[in-house]
Protein backbone atom coordinates (compact mmCIF):
# COMPACT_ATOMS: atom_id res chain seq x y z
CA UNK A 1 0.00 0.00 0.00
CA UNK A 2 1.42 3.43 -0.99
CA UNK A 3 1.88 6.26 1.50
CA UNK A 4 -0.84 8.32 -0.20
CA UNK A 5 -3.29 5.43 0.07
CA UNK A 6 -2.52 4.98 3.76
CA UNK A 7 -3.02 8.70 4.40
CA UNK A 8 -6.31 8.69 2.50
CA UNK A 9 -7.51 5.68 4.49
CA UNK A 10 -6.55 7.29 7.80
CA UNK A 11 -8.32 10.54 6.91
CA UNK A 12 -11.41 8.64 5.84
CA UNK A 13 -11.55 6.71 9.10
CA UNK A 14 -10.99 9.86 11.15
CA UNK A 15 -13.82 11.65 9.39
CA UNK A 16 -16.41 8.89 9.72
CA UNK A 17 -17.74 9.82 13.19
CA UNK A 18 -18.01 13.51 12.30
CA UNK A 19 -19.89 12.81 9.07
CA UNK A 20 -22.91 11.53 10.98
CA UNK A 21 -23.22 14.57 13.28
CA UNK A 22 -25.13 16.79 10.86
CA UNK A 23 -27.63 14.16 9.66
CA UNK A 24 -28.27 12.89 13.20
CA UNK A 25 -28.85 16.39 14.57
CA UNK A 26 -31.26 17.17 11.73
CA UNK A 27 -33.12 13.87 12.18
CA UNK A 28 -33.20 14.37 15.95
CA UNK A 29 -34.60 17.86 15.48
CA UNK A 30 -37.40 16.65 13.21
CA UNK A 31 -38.43 13.82 15.52
CA UNK A 32 -38.20 16.04 18.62
CA UNK A 33 -40.47 18.64 17.02
CA UNK A 34 -42.91 15.98 15.80
CA UNK A 35 -43.00 14.17 19.15
CA UNK A 36 -43.72 17.39 21.00
CA UNK A 37 -46.42 18.37 18.52
CA UNK A 38 -48.46 15.20 19.08
CA UNK A 39 -47.76 14.89 22.82
CA UNK A 40 -51.04 14.15 24.66
CA UNK A 41 -52.39 16.88 26.90
CA UNK A 42 -54.62 16.91 29.96
CA UNK A 43 -57.79 18.73 30.96
CA UNK A 44 -56.02 20.83 33.57
CA UNK A 45 -58.48 19.66 36.22
CA UNK A 46 -57.81 17.58 39.32
CA UNK A 47 -54.49 16.74 40.93
CA UNK A 48 -51.18 16.45 39.12
CA UNK A 49 -51.46 12.66 39.42
CA UNK A 50 -54.87 12.61 37.72
CA UNK A 51 -53.57 14.90 34.99
CA UNK A 52 -50.64 12.55 34.44
CA UNK A 53 -53.04 9.62 34.23
CA UNK A 54 -55.00 11.41 31.50
CA UNK A 55 -51.86 11.70 29.42
CA UNK A 56 -50.69 8.15 30.11
CA UNK A 57 -53.92 6.62 28.82
CA UNK A 58 -54.09 8.95 25.81
CA UNK A 59 -53.88 7.31 22.41
CA UNK A 60 -50.91 9.46 21.39
CA UNK A 61 -48.71 8.60 24.37
CA UNK A 62 -46.73 5.87 22.63
CA UNK A 63 -46.38 7.55 19.21
CA UNK A 64 -45.29 10.81 20.81
CA UNK A 65 -42.77 9.31 23.17
CA UNK A 66 -41.41 6.89 20.58
CA UNK A 67 -40.54 9.93 18.49
CA UNK A 68 -39.05 11.72 21.49
CA UNK A 69 -36.99 8.64 22.33
CA UNK A 70 -35.71 8.53 18.76
CA UNK A 71 -34.82 12.22 19.06
CA UNK A 72 -32.94 11.68 22.31
CA UNK A 73 -31.03 8.78 20.79
CA UNK A 74 -30.11 10.83 17.71
CA UNK A 75 -28.94 13.75 19.84
CA UNK A 76 -26.87 11.48 22.09
CA UNK A 77 -25.21 9.70 19.17
CA UNK A 78 -24.53 12.99 17.37
CA UNK A 79 -22.94 14.57 20.44
CA UNK A 80 -20.81 11.48 21.11
CA UNK A 81 -19.63 11.52 17.49
CA UNK A 82 -18.92 15.25 17.64
CA UNK A 83 -16.91 14.68 20.80
CA UNK A 84 -14.51 12.46 18.84
CA UNK A 85 -13.53 15.17 16.36
CA UNK A 86 -10.25 16.93 16.85
CA UNK A 87 -9.52 20.61 17.11
CA UNK A 88 -12.00 21.43 19.87
CA UNK A 89 -10.84 24.02 22.36
CA UNK A 90 -10.64 23.15 26.03
CA UNK A 91 -13.92 24.86 26.88
CA UNK A 92 -15.87 23.31 24.00
CA UNK A 93 -14.40 19.88 24.72
CA UNK A 94 -15.46 20.16 28.36
CA UNK A 95 -19.00 21.20 27.46
CA UNK A 96 -19.32 18.45 24.86
CA UNK A 97 -18.05 15.82 27.28
CA UNK A 98 -20.51 16.80 30.00
CA UNK A 99 -23.46 17.09 27.63
CA UNK A 100 -22.69 13.71 26.05
CA UNK A 101 -23.03 12.02 29.45
CA UNK A 102 -26.29 13.83 30.16
CA UNK A 103 -27.60 12.93 26.71
CA UNK A 104 -26.98 9.22 27.23
CA UNK A 105 -28.66 9.26 30.66
CA UNK A 106 -31.60 11.22 29.23
CA UNK A 107 -32.05 8.62 26.49
CA UNK A 108 -32.28 5.88 29.10
CA UNK A 109 -34.71 8.04 31.08
CA UNK A 110 -36.90 8.60 28.04
CA UNK A 111 -37.01 4.84 27.47
CA UNK A 112 -38.45 4.37 30.96
CA UNK A 113 -40.77 7.33 30.42
CA UNK A 114 -42.10 5.74 27.23
CA UNK A 115 -43.28 2.68 29.15
CA UNK A 116 -44.74 4.63 32.07
CA UNK A 117 -48.15 4.10 30.47
CA UNK A 118 -47.94 0.43 31.44
CA UNK A 119 -48.31 1.52 35.06
CA UNK A 120 -51.02 4.14 34.48
CA UNK A 121 -53.58 2.56 36.82
CA UNK A 122 -51.04 2.03 39.58
CA UNK A 123 -49.90 5.65 39.34
CA UNK A 124 -53.51 6.84 39.44
CA UNK A 125 -54.06 4.71 42.55
CA UNK A 126 -51.16 6.34 44.34
CA UNK A 127 -48.81 3.36 44.19
CA UNK A 128 -45.13 4.34 44.44
CA UNK A 129 -43.92 1.81 41.90
CA UNK A 130 -40.49 1.68 40.29
CA UNK A 131 -41.84 3.21 37.10
CA UNK A 132 -43.46 6.03 39.07
CA UNK A 133 -40.25 6.76 40.94
CA UNK A 134 -38.18 6.60 37.75
CA UNK A 135 -40.59 8.93 35.99
CA UNK A 136 -40.45 11.44 38.83
CA UNK A 137 -36.65 11.48 38.82
CA UNK A 138 -36.57 11.69 35.04
CA UNK A 139 -38.98 14.63 34.86
CA UNK A 140 -37.60 16.69 37.72
CA UNK A 141 -33.86 16.04 37.35
CA UNK A 142 -32.76 14.34 34.12
CA UNK A 143 -34.96 16.25 31.67
CA UNK A 144 -34.06 19.67 33.14
CA UNK A 145 -30.36 18.76 32.95
CA UNK A 146 -30.82 17.70 29.34
CA UNK A 147 -32.45 21.03 28.51
CA UNK A 148 -29.64 22.92 30.20
CA UNK A 149 -27.12 20.75 28.38
CA UNK A 150 -28.63 21.55 24.99
CA UNK A 151 -28.65 25.25 25.89
CA UNK A 152 -24.99 25.10 26.91
CA UNK A 153 -24.04 23.19 23.75
CA UNK A 154 -25.89 25.70 21.57
CA UNK A 155 -24.13 28.64 23.23
CA UNK A 156 -20.64 27.11 23.26
CA UNK A 157 -21.03 25.71 19.76
CA UNK A 158 -22.44 28.96 18.42
CA UNK A 159 -19.74 31.15 19.91
CA UNK A 160 -16.96 28.87 18.66
CA UNK A 161 -18.81 28.23 15.37
CA UNK A 162 -18.27 24.50 15.76
CA UNK A 163 -22.02 23.82 16.06
CA UNK A 164 -24.00 26.61 14.47
CA UNK A 165 -23.14 30.28 14.88
CA UNK A 166 -23.97 33.25 17.15
CA UNK A 167 -27.37 33.56 15.46
CA UNK A 168 -28.50 29.94 15.80
CA UNK A 169 -27.39 29.72 19.41
CA UNK A 170 -30.45 31.77 20.43
CA UNK A 171 -32.74 28.95 19.23
CA UNK A 172 -31.00 26.29 21.30
CA UNK A 173 -30.58 28.57 24.31
CA UNK A 174 -34.23 29.64 24.53
CA UNK A 175 -35.55 26.19 23.68
CA UNK A 176 -33.25 24.46 26.15
CA UNK A 177 -34.06 26.82 29.01
CA UNK A 178 -37.80 26.56 28.32
CA UNK A 179 -37.66 22.76 28.29
CA UNK A 180 -35.60 22.70 31.47
CA UNK A 181 -37.89 24.99 33.47
CA UNK A 182 -41.12 23.38 32.25
CA UNK A 183 -39.85 19.86 32.96
CA UNK A 184 -38.50 20.69 36.42
CA UNK A 185 -41.82 22.12 37.58
CA UNK A 186 -44.41 19.99 35.78
CA UNK A 187 -44.86 17.63 38.75
CA UNK A 188 -45.66 20.50 41.09
CA UNK A 189 -47.39 23.28 39.17
CA UNK A 190 -49.02 24.11 35.83
CA UNK A 191 -47.56 27.60 35.85
CA UNK A 192 -44.76 26.86 33.42
CA UNK A 193 -46.48 24.26 31.22
CA UNK A 194 -46.93 26.92 28.54
CA UNK A 195 -43.17 26.83 28.00
CA UNK A 196 -43.28 23.37 26.43
CA UNK A 197 -44.29 24.68 22.97
CA UNK A 198 -41.35 27.10 23.20
CA UNK A 199 -39.11 24.11 23.82
CA UNK A 200 -39.77 23.05 20.22
CA UNK A 201 -37.08 25.59 19.33
CA UNK A 202 -34.65 22.82 20.27
CA UNK A 203 -35.89 20.87 17.27
CA UNK A 204 -35.58 23.87 14.97
CA UNK A 205 -32.08 24.58 16.27
CA UNK A 206 -31.00 20.98 15.68
CA UNK A 207 -32.34 20.92 12.12
CA UNK A 208 -30.72 24.25 11.24
CA UNK A 209 -27.27 23.47 12.66
CA UNK A 210 -27.45 19.91 11.36
CA UNK A 211 -28.02 21.13 7.82
CA UNK A 212 -25.30 23.76 8.26
CA UNK A 213 -22.81 21.04 9.14
CA UNK A 214 -23.43 18.99 6.00
CA UNK A 215 -21.61 21.23 3.46
CA UNK A 216 -19.06 22.28 6.08
CA UNK A 217 -17.91 18.70 6.52
CA UNK A 218 -17.56 18.21 2.79
CA UNK A 219 -15.49 21.37 2.40
CA UNK A 220 -13.30 20.74 5.44
CA UNK A 221 -12.70 17.14 4.43
CA UNK A 222 -11.48 18.13 0.97
CA UNK A 223 -9.40 21.02 2.22
CA UNK A 224 -7.72 18.97 4.92
CA UNK A 225 -6.95 15.94 2.83
CA UNK A 226 -5.45 17.62 -0.22
CA UNK A 227 -2.28 19.02 1.43
CA UNK A 228 -1.70 15.82 3.35
CA UNK A 229 -2.04 13.72 0.22
CA UNK A 230 0.25 16.02 -1.73
CA UNK A 231 2.92 15.75 0.95
CA UNK A 232 2.48 12.00 1.15
CA UNK A 233 2.78 11.54 -2.62
CA UNK A 234 5.86 13.77 -2.72
CA UNK A 235 7.56 11.82 0.04
CA UNK A 236 6.63 8.58 -1.63
Regions from the language model: what does each represent?
Residues 2-236:
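Hydrophobic, aromatic-enriched alpha-helical segments typical of multi-pass transmembrane helices
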Amino acid sequence: MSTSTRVRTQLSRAGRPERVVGPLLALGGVTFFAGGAIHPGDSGRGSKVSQLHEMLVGSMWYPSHALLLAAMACFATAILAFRRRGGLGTGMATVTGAVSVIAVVATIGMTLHLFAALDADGIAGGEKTFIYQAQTWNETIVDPLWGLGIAALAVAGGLTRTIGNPITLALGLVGGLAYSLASATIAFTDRFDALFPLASLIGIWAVVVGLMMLPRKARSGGAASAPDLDRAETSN
